[in-house]
Regions:
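Short, surface-exposed, polar/charged, turn-prone segments marking secondary-structure boundaries
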Residues: 99-104, 169-170, 226-228, 234-237, ...
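C-terminal/domain-terminus segments
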Residues: 344, 399, 529-533
């Protein structure tokens, strides 16, 4: 049917003003639609016990993707499953906005045949594999179809609209499959950047930015040893896909580095798989990094609640808790940090100065080296907290460390550092509890007749139960010792968040977003930009919890739980 129309269409091309449909626009549109749709769904999910059935947690379109593909991302549910947010009008607004320029109507043209998967893949860094003429990345979008005939009608409709917009079309039968594509043989070269090719293969509609992308997808299907499923790294990664994952991303890290023009430094990990799982409270994003090297966790997995958390108040804005910091610098987490920061920023020091500026300032002002002066003697449980400070923009802090044989020497070392920085280390009684205070004492004179002495406490610490407790001020320590305030462990928000994290694990990083965003926006200006990009998510975010829970050799597995209203 389509070939008969092409000649008439091409004769009136010059009279048409309809804009062309560009694959980059379609890809960006689909990604945006999925992210906004899912984020909006999270909002609704927190108010209604809706469940989504995931039929298959492994992307079926992987059979079309090369084993050397840098990246593949898949939505594994039908977008209609997310349309519960239709009550807020968001889904219709987003689809109408994204597809407006394409003259494609989602309800009539796509919805009738779309099944339970949409996959986007970067298939190759350079389509013609000739770097001398520049690099042109190959992109493939695969949409699962329940009705191949209707999806073929959609494909013909899509290319008919492109023909009416002024594009010359070509049709080729490749290995038994009809491939429709933009034919730029007589067109300007720059238009190739906006080209589109498509085919219906088995139960998928394939769209690519070049006919060669579609042809290679067909090759990968017919020669299974070429496709991603035959990759040992991918096979190992898919074993880590979370149950009921609604979306999955696979990254070939060396190829991602080449694609982005980065040299993969400190290359411990060679692949990553990310899964997104919904529950009644929010979203769990689980990530697994894989390596053939031997890696070790920073500490033995913890299957019981961390006792040091009992001393953190319910109002804690940020909590970091775990065990054994002494091995952190040699752990799997440290190797991942080095690989990521060295690749992107050149080295870890540059990354720390840019991303963790507040920590750098603390080290410089106190003359500290965290690894040598603190981490080395923390071999038991620990908990670190930041608390909102109504009297100052600088938050209060708490550091709790379990008693171990190394603790006495570690405390003495910190007291010595405080003394060398000019602070007075003195003992005082606080409700019959012996406390050591780091105090900055200054004296000023008035008219040579009187002298005023001002003492500012920079930190205090004391032994309590089986822990040493450090705080930024006496008021915070007094509240802990009185045991009249509720513990963070009694905070329903915190309790619900850590319940989602698998056990055993390496501990938690817990951020109460509602209670801490003002603190971190002041300290990390980049966070404001991130918040704008993820506005649908951040608008409804209560807290986020990060944990690591690797259980198999050669893997580093962890998750981030976004708790939503």
């Amino acid at each position: 049917m389509l070939p008969e129309k092409l000649e008439n269409i091409n004769n009136v091309n010059s009279q048409q003003s309809t804009k062309n449909i560009k694959l980059p626009f379609l890809v960006a549109g689909v990604i945006t639609l999925l992210l906004i749709g899912i984020a909006g769904f999270y909002w609704f999910l927190g108010k209604s016990p809706v469940s989504i059935v995931v039929r298959n947690s492994q992307p079926g379109a992987a059979i079309f993707v090369s084993k050397s593909s840098p990246a593949m991302v898949s939505l594994l549910v039908n977008p209609d499953a997310l349309q519960t947010i239709e009550q807020k009008g968001a889904f219709s607004q987003v689809t109408n906005s994204l597809l407006a320029k394409s003259n494609i109507d989602y309800q009539n043209d796509i919805k009738p045949w779309l099944s339970n998967e949409i996959t986007l893949a970067v298939t190759t860094i350079d389509i013609d594999r000739d770097p001398e003429n520049g690099l042109q990345t190959g992109y493939l979008m695969a949409l699962a179809t329940e009705q191949p005939e209707k999806s073929r009608e959609f494909l013909e409709l899509l290319f008919s609209k492109r023909a009416f917009a002024g594009t010359n079309l070509g049709i080729e039968r490749y290995k038994g499959v009809k491939v429709i594509y933009d034919n730029f043989e007589y067109s300007q070269v720059e238009n190739i950047q906006n080209s589109l090719a498509g085919a219906v293969v088995n139960n998928f509609v394939l769209l690519g930015n070049h006919p060669q992308v579609i042809k290679e997808a067909i090759n990968n299907l017919q020669a299974p040893d070429l496709n991603l499923i035959s990759s040992l790294a991918y096979q190992k990664a898919t074993q880590q896909i979370s149950k009921n994952a609604v979306a999955v991303t696979f990254l070939n890290l060396p190829e991602v580095g080449k694609w982005q023009g980065l040299e993969l430094a400190e290359s411990t990990y060679d692949s990553q798989i990310l899964s997104l799982v919904l529950n009644s409270q929010g979203l769990l994003a689980e990530s697994t990094f894989l390596t053939n090297s031997q890696v070790v966790p920073p500490s033995l997995p913890l299957s019981q609640p961390i006792g040091a958390l009992h001393y953190l108040p319910e109002s804690t804005a940020l909590a970091i808790a775990g065990a054994n910091l002494s091995n952190l610098v040699n752990s799997d987490l440290a190797k991942l940090w080095k690989q990521g920061t060295a690749t992107i920023y050149g080295d870890s020091k540059n990354a720390i100065s840019l991303l963790l500026k507040p920590l750098v300032e603390i080290q410089q002002s106190w003359g500290l080296n965290f690894s040598q002066d603190i981490f080395s003697w923390v071999v038991g449980e620990y908990a670190l907290a930041l608390l909102p400070n109504s009297e100052n923009i600088i938050p209060n802090w708490i550091f709790v460390v379990e008693k171990t044989p190394q603790l006495v020497a570690g405390i003495a070392h910190l007291d010595n550092i405080a003394s060398t920085r000019g602070f007075n280390v003195s003992s005082l009684n606080l409700d019959e509890q012996k406390v050591l205070a780091w105090t900055q004492i200054t004296a000023t004179s008035e008219n040579n007749t009187s002298i005023n002495v001002d003492a500012k406490i920079k930190g205090v610490h004391t032994t309590f139960d089986n822990y040493e407790i450090f705080t930024s001020d006496l008021k915070t320590l007094t509240a802990i010792l009185s045991q009249k305030q509720k513990s963070l462990l009694k905070n329903p928000k915190f309790h619900n968040a850590i319940t989602v994290i698998p056990q055993p694990n390496q501990g938690y990083i817990y951020l109460d977003w509602e209670n801490s965003q003002d603190i971190f926006k002041r300290q990390l200006p980049l966070l404001k930009f991130v918040e704008v990009l993820g506005k649908p998510l951040f608008d409804n975010l209560q807290s986020l919890t990060v944990s690591s829970y690797s259980s198999e050799p050669g893997t580093l597995k962890g998750g981030i739980f976004f708790q939503l209203h």
